[in-house]
Each structure stands twice: as structure tokens, then as C-alpha cells.
Amino acid sequence: MNKRPLIEQALKRVNNRYELVHAAAKLAKDLYETGAESYVTEEGIPLKKTVISINEIAKGRAVILRKE
């Protein structure tokens, strides 16, 4: 599975890589704290919370709030 296109897609929704890392880390932490279920790939491999969070950002399911 090539992760590069997923990251490029997520970068279209944020200003820069650092903001993406920060947002993905916060979302992954929230997923761990709430005990959210892990997604499983078609091959039966469970995805890590960090990959799930980047995927959610890339698909526009996660709202990123910015301090102005």
C-alpha cells in the first residue's frame, strides 16, 4: 500500500506538512482515548490510529480548527 498519495491528498486540506502532522497526532490521540474501533484493510490488516487519522483528514471527514 503506497501511503504517498494519501498524504498528498491530505496536504490539499491543510496549509503545510507541520499542520498535517499536528492535526493527525491530535486526532490519533482522540481515537486512542475514546477507544475507537480500528479499520481493517481488504487484506485483513488492521490500520493504526495515525493512518486512520490521516485518512480521515484526506477524505475531509475531520474538521481542522485553526487559531487566527
Swiss-Prot record:
* Subunit structure, interactors included: The RNAP catalytic core consists of 2 alpha, 1 beta, 1 beta' and 1 omega subunit. When a sigma factor is associated with the core the holoenzyme is formed, which can initiate transcription.
Q: Which GO terms describe its molecular function?
A: DNA binding; DNA-directed RNA polymerase activity
Is Transcription a UniProt keyword of this protein?
Answer: yes
Which SUPFAM superfamilies does the annotation name? Answer: RPB6/omega subunit-like (SSF63562)
Instruction: Return the HAMAP family for the record.
Output: RNApol_bact_RpoZ (MF_00366)
For this chain, the family text in UniProt reads:
Belongs to the RNA polymerase subunit omega family.
Q: Answer yes or no on keyword Repeat.
A: no
- Gene Ontology terms, cellular component aspect? DNA-directed RNA polymerase complex
What is the name attached to this protein's record?
DNA-directed RNA polymerase subunit omega
Keywords attached to this Swiss-Prot or TrEMBL record, sorted alphabetically, are: DNA-directed RNA polymerase, Nucleotidyltransferase, Transcription, Transferase
Where does this protein come from, organism-wise? Persephonella marina (strain DSM 14350 / EX-H1)
Q: What does this protein do?
A: Promotes RNA polymerase assembly. Latches the N- and C-terminal regions of the beta' subunit thereby facilitating its interaction with the beta and alpha subunits.
Signal sequence annotation: none
Q: Which InterPro entries match?
A: DNA-dir_RNA_pol_omega, Pol_omega/Rpo6/RPB6, RPB6/omega-like_sf
Q: Which Pfam families match?
A: RNA_pol_Rpb6
* Reactions it catalyzes: RNA(n) + a ribonucleoside 5'-triphosphate = RNA(n+1) + diphosphate
Q: In the Enzyme Commission scheme, what number(s) does this protein have?
A: 2.7.7.6
Any one biological process term the GO annotation gives: DNA-templated transcription
